Regions:
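Polysaccharide-binding surfaces and accessory modules of carbohydrate-active proteins
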Residues: 82-84, 88-192, 207-209, 241-271
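Non-catalytic carbohydrate-binding regions of carbohydrate-active enzymes
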Residues: 476, 483-499, 505-510, 555-665, ...
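Helix-terminus loop motifs that line ligand-binding clefts
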Residues: 70-75, 82, 297-307, 317, ...
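Short Pro-Gly-centered flexible turn/kink motifs
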Residues: 70, 119, 213-234
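Low-complexity, Ser/Thr/Pro/Gly-enriched N-terminal "stalk/linker" regions
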Residues: 1-5, 233-235, 248-317, 340, ...
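An extended acidic
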Residues: 1-86, 159-188, 254-280
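Extended ligand-binding clefts on enzyme/binding-domain cores
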Residues: 161-178, 182, 354-360, 364-371, ...
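Iron-sulfur cluster-binding cysteine motifs and their immediate structural context
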Residues: 758-774, 790-807
């Protein structure tokens, strides 16, 4: 079941399912210690049923009668949830957020009475908490000093309470046994609209609280619910004191302002990316931040429902996922978050220079299914691409930010040990890496993806060595990389298939017996073929994009072109949903056995890899547009909230597996940035050959001089209503030069507008303004247009049009097509 809404701050993460029930509550680490994983925390209301003779009803939001829409407030990590119950004649509008600094979640509940009489509405919330992730030895009790219901065990405390009109209070409560000896929980106690008031329970426990609200006919009332997490009762008291002073609405206001500032801080010009894609880009950045622990661990996903399939979760740090996510954050302009991840890697890398399968957020090795013995010989239980990608990402970070003081210890503690490991963990017969597990964590062998990433990692290590003046290591790492490239060209490309193969599986198990001894191998003799020592896995796999992604071979190489053409043709899902599958006959969460039409479920990352390929090969802005339908496909298949799952149902588009998947959102970010950077390199002025489009806008508070710095005063943002801006405007005006009356139509094709601001700069009447990175018409000032057409002449991408006719001509000016009205 997907998590439609995650909200968090790096210490406290709370997730909601499609029925608007809390399903996960992680504290104090994101992804570790899920205190709400036992079952749904129900949310509901109790009131009379209008027209039913005084009959009463309690309805939880999981009931089918509710219509629920879950979104976020724009550019924030504050939810925007609407709930409607036609039988109860009640509607609710809710906002949820976690304070950007403190472990406090606030829910604002606005209740509207749609009946024609005054009513008492009881709001119920059920807590099915299990401290430390297990229902053993917990206590739930009502605390009169805290005026809340507290669950605790050892150094984990969670309190729930209500606020209304500045007053904190709970009107009813109950604690009891849950999930033991057939006890379903205290939510059953609420079904008659009353709670028994049991003040304490111990063992396998749950609780329910209620707040009574008097709502006049046709009016609405607002209350708040707060969830506070801490390490002790004393800490809860301090946080309660702070919240009482700040008030819940203050938390919502300050948290919304923080995340708007955070996501907008890079001042990116989104060029001609469609508005829905821009919105998904920003949402992806915000969702990414919810999945990252403040200690540096980037968690793959926090959706505990996956436990029903394997009794384990995705709530771990995979170095591969983490490296790719950190790289996307570096690209987007968030190096501080990425640095925390690189420092985490510095703490956990083994002394022999490789990373284990995955890690817990606290840095300890996590559960694994990779064996230490294969074919009766000791094996490395690793995915070598994870080691390579960390080094690859670190180099890209340094190259972009040049923070030499930061990377100096990483060069010593991470890059060198990892590079030495990658150099020696190779089959001397082929030059290729020795076997390990693949990125899909399913198969053992020598994988094209791993080969490409190890090549990229060694090239990155070579660059570090050059920067640090170590000629010997630079030559060593480069030589190993070139040997890998030669081996890939010789052994991984199939002339028969005219493409790269997925993997090689050794017949004689060339696996090192331990971490230090690597057995010597003789080179292949003249008449020996690769098939004599390796079995070739010819399966077409979307991860073959790696051969150009990590520059093992360039995207214009005929071998790469042929490979990617076959990936697109054979792995595109041939249903109305579309998208790219991982590989042919993918079994993971399989929906269809029609392999010809549905080779596997469509994955967001695999589909975006195809866009990456189109972007890499683009030579003109027109070539670049081949990627736009894939961006639009991604945005169109997200949940209503903008959350992306790992994969979707090929027939219904329902999310499958975990949701959100951090890697999915990171791939949106990195691919979009790559698109914009490529657009900047292609959209050049014909006169000066300089970029017309620039991805990075000038910051609104950029300091240009000491005088500017001294005079600057921050102000609260004043946002014009978007209703006054449009891509199309028509008006009638007298031409002062001729005295004649004209009809005019001004239009902007926002799909191709790259946000260069040239037309806005030449509009001296304030008719054109920049809104969300696009030039739009301010309808309030439209009649001020002097109709001289300068905005049309200066537009470098020909997206501005102005059509003028004499007013006596009854035919209205024809608007250029197609147009996207972003009003």
């Amino acid at each position: 079941m997907p998590r439609d809404i995650p909200v968090g701050n790096g210490r406290l993460l709370v997730t909601f399912d499609h029925k608007y029930q809390i399903r996960d509550l992680y504290f104090p680490h994101v992804g570790q210690e899920n205190h709400a994983g036992a079952g749904p925390c129900r949310f509901g209301v109790h009131s009379d049923l209008p027209g039913k003779g005084g009959k009463q009803l309690l309805s939880w939001t999981q009931d089918a009668a509710w219509t629920i829409h879950q979104r976020y407030l724009r550019d924030t990590l504050t939810s925007s949830v609407t709930l409607d119950h036609p039988d109860l004649k009640l509607a609710m509008y809710c906002n949820d957020c976690v304070d950007f600094h403190r472990p406090i979640m606030i829910r604002k509940i606005k209740i509207k009475n749609l009946a024609d009489h005054d009513r008492v509405v009881k709001v119920f919330h059920h807590q099915d908490f299990n401290m430390f992730g297990t229902k053993i030895g917990d206590t739930a009790y009502y605390d009169p000093e805290l005026r809340g219901l507290v669950h605790y065990r050892a150094k984990r405390y969670v309190m729930v309470t209500f606020f209304q009109s500045g007053e904190q209070r709970i009107d009813e409560y109950a604690t009891g046994t849950s999930g033991f000896h057939g006890a379903e929980g205290t939510w059953r106690d609420a079904e008659d609209g009353h709670l028994q008031g049991n003040a304490i329970a111990q063992g396998a426990v749950d609780s329910t609280i209620a707040h009574h609200v008097n709502v006049p006919a046709g009016e609405e009332k607002t209350i708040y619910m707060a969830i506070i997490a801490g390490h002790s009762r004393e800490e809860l008291l301090e946080l309660q004191k702070w919240l009482t002073k700040m008030q819940p609405q203050g938390v919502i206001d300050r948290t919304g302002a923080y995340w708007r500032l955070w996501v907008g801080g890079t001042n990116i010009n989104f060029g001609n990316l469609p508005p829905k894609v821009v919105e998904l880009f920003k949402r992806s950045l915000l969702v990414l931040r919810t999945q990252i622990d403040n200690g540096g661990a980037i968690i793959a996903a926090n959706d505990s429902d996956i436990m029903q399939f394997s009794r384990d979760t995705y709530s771990y740090m995979w170095p591969r996922d983490g490296a790719l996510v950190a790289d996307s954050l570096d690209l987007a302009g968030f190096p501080d978050v990425a640095r925390n991840f690189y420092t985490f890697c510095q703490r956990v890398i083994t002394k022999d220079g490789y990373f284990y399968h995955k890690y817990n957020p606290d840095g300890s090795p996590a559960s694994s299914w990779h064996p230490w013995v294969i074919k009766n010989e000791r094996a490395m239980p690793i995915q070598e691409d994870e080691t390579a990608l960390v080094v690859w990402a670190m180099w890209r970070h340094y190259f972009r930010y040049r923070d030499i003081e930061f990377v100096r210890p990483l060069w010593v503690d991470v890059v060198q040990p990892a590079a030495e490991f990658m150099c020696r963990y190779r089959d001397i017969r082929t030059g290729l890496p020795l076997p390990s597990y693949d990125l899909w964590e399913e198969r053992w062998g020598v994988h094209a993806f791993t080969v490409a990433t190890v090549y990229g990692g060694l090239k990155a290590a070579r660059n570090f060595a050059v920067c640090f003046g170590d000629r010997e290591k630079a030559e060593k790492y480069n030589q190993a990389a070139e040997e890998i490239k030669a081996g890939a060209a010789k052994y991984l490309f199939s002339d028969k298939l005219d493409r790269f193969v997925r993997r090689l599986v050794p017949k004689d198990s060339p696996v090192p017996p331990d971490d230090h001894e690597y057995r010597e191998r003789e080179n292949l003799v003249a008449d020996e073929e690769i098939e004599d020592i390796y079995e070739v896995d010819e399966t077409i796999d979307a991860s073959l994009y790696s051969v150009f992604k990590f520059h093992l071979f360039e995207a214009d190489d005929p071998r790469v072109i042929s490979t990617m053409k076959q990936v697109e043709e054979k792995l595109w899902v041939k249903t109305r949903v579309g998208g790219v599958a991982r590989y042919e006959n993918d079994y993971y969460h399989r929906i269809s056995n029609d392999i010809a039409a549905v080779p596997g479920n469509p994955w967001f990352i695999c589909t975006l890899w195809l866009a990456d390929y189109f972007i890499t090969r683009a030579k003109t802005p027109a070539d670049l547009k081949l990627a736009l339908p894939i961006f639009e496909w991604t945005a169109g298949h997200a949940l209503e909230s903008g959350v992306l799952a790992e994969q979707v149902n090929p027939y219904t588009n329902e999310p499958i597996s975990v949701s959100p998947l951090t890697w999915s959102h990171a791939t949106v970010v990195s691919t979009a940035i790559k698109y914009l950077e490529k657009l900047e390199s292609l959209q050049l002025c014909n006169t000066c050959n300089q970029p017309i489009f620039r991805m990075r806008r000038q910051g609104p508070v950029e300091v240009k001089s000491q005088a500017t710095f001294d005079r600057f005063e921050a102000e609260f943002e004043i946002t014009d209503s978007r209703e006054v801006f449009s891509a199309v405007g028509q008006f009638v005006k007298n031409d002062p030069r001729s005295g004649q009356k004209f009809q005019a139509a001004l239009a902007i094709d926002t799909r191709d507008c790259i946000g260069c601001e040239v037309c806005v700069a030449h509009c001296h009447r304030d008719v054109l303004k920049m809104v969300d990175g696009k030039a739009l018409i301010d309808l309030r000032n439209l009649n001020a247009c002097d109709m001289d057409g300068e905005c049309v002449e200066v537009c470098p991408t020909d997206v501005v049009s102005l059509i003028i006719r004499p007013a006596e001509d009854s035919t209205p000016p024809e608007m250029p097509k197609p147009l996207l009205n972003t009003k």
